[in-house]
Amino acid sequence: MADEATRRVVSEIPVLKTNAGPRDRELWVQRLKEEYQSLIRYVENNKNADNDWFRLESNKEGTRWFGKCWYIHDFLKYEFDIEFEIPITYPTTAPEIAVPELDGKTAKMYRGGKICLTDHFKPLWARNVPKFGLAHLMALGLGPWLAVEVPDLIQKGVIQHKEKCNQ
């Protein structure tokens, strides 16, 4: 992990205990409870720090997740849909988050709008199985990716704020 602020944020996210994925039936239900508790705590901490930046929800089985994330740049809010599926080998394998509307707009993305997390995030995830969960994926995966990529895409004129597009 990079800086002290990141360490502090991550230290406030509850770690998970149940090593289970979607194939594990009853244990998966327990893991999902832990995932939700961890996500709720992370969102509450973000709101308390005036750093609210995403919403997530899942299907009934907890295997498909979707929502919105946003990034504030020059006092303008850029909002994006996000989605991911829980891999069958979860938690050993981290989910791959997709930001479909940015598909093909940056080199740090795979087909289908899946963001590239291989160099920095996936080794960290692998060292922390099963303690890391979806809140950690957001805090250490999507959050830093947005912080680097969105300003760059704005500067290059690849994305524009919706209000600027309507003028």
Swiss-Prot record:
Top-level taxon of the source organism: Eukaryota
Q: How is it modified after translation?
A: Ufmylated at Lys-122. Deufmylated by UFSP1.
A GO molecular-function descriptor:
UFM1 transferase activity
Which CDD domains does this chain map to? UBCc_UFC1
Keyword annotations from UniProtKB, A to Z? Isopeptide bond, Ubl conjugation, Ubl conjugation pathway
Cite the record's note on assembly.
Interacts with UBA5 (via C-terminus). Interacts with UFL1. Interacts with UFM1. Interacts with KIRREL3.
Q: Give the protein family.
A: Belongs to the ubiquitin-conjugating enzyme family. UFC1 subfamily.
List the protein's name: Ubiquitin-fold modifier-conjugating enzyme 1
Gene that this polypeptide is encoded by: Ufc1
